[in-house]
Amino acid sequence: MNRAIVAIACLVFLIALPAHAAPSQREQQLFDLVNHEREKAGLNKLEWNDHLAEAALAHSKLLAENRDLSHQFSGEPILQERVGATKLRFNSVAENVAESPDVVTAHTALMKSPGHRANILHQDYNAIGISIVERDHTLFITQDFAHTLASYTEKQFRESVIANFNQARRARKMSPVDVISDPHLRKAACSQDMHTNKMIQNMPGVSGLLVFSLSEPGALPDDMRKYTSDKTLQRMNIGVCLQTGGVTGFSKFWVVAAFYRSAEYNQ
């Protein structure tokens, strides 16, 4: 009895080709198998992502061309750069590659390998792109996983941070605070000169100043959450600046938040 030989490899990072077409029948089959495993494990299903599929296609072509498994061939960018080049915003990414005679055999082998299984069942990932390229009756498979981020403008992100802050105050039976607008705070956020003592000197009436970075507006840092229970807090100002990750795709927003207590605020 002949046994199919399957080669697999995986890669994880916590950090211009034509657009990929709709998934082929084989790619759809593997996509469905992945989501079936996640559903059995009580996890969210992954969404198909054309950006990830585009990156996966480029790599599967190299797998087939070289008749070998690797996460980076000579002259090829690393995984996060390949995915970042598609303009996808994300904060974690991983990859499985496999060589197999058919989809089911490949999927079975991936699920038996701890590293590959961990990628397939990673609870933080929300998207996947798959590419399968056939050469000489062998399938060369790339699965690219990611936790993708919403595409906020700076204005949208700032408004969401403010809304989440005031929502947290309401949950503590506190009144929402007024928000003033000072373009200097955005400039400070974009400057990457994060010396808070220096900034406070140029902002009369400020009783507290925080500088931090976020990928999602709902993930307020603990130091900012402390102000949600401050009874004396009257106003605040927030400056937001998007710092793109360049080719790596790991984009984030820098935030400068100034707080004014009622007795100290000067109009």
Predicted regions located by residue number:
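Positively charged n-region of N-terminal signal peptides that target proteins for export
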Residues: M1-A4
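Bacterial N-terminal signal peptides
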Residues: A7-A16
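Functional surface patches built around histidine and acidic residues
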Residues: H20-Q267
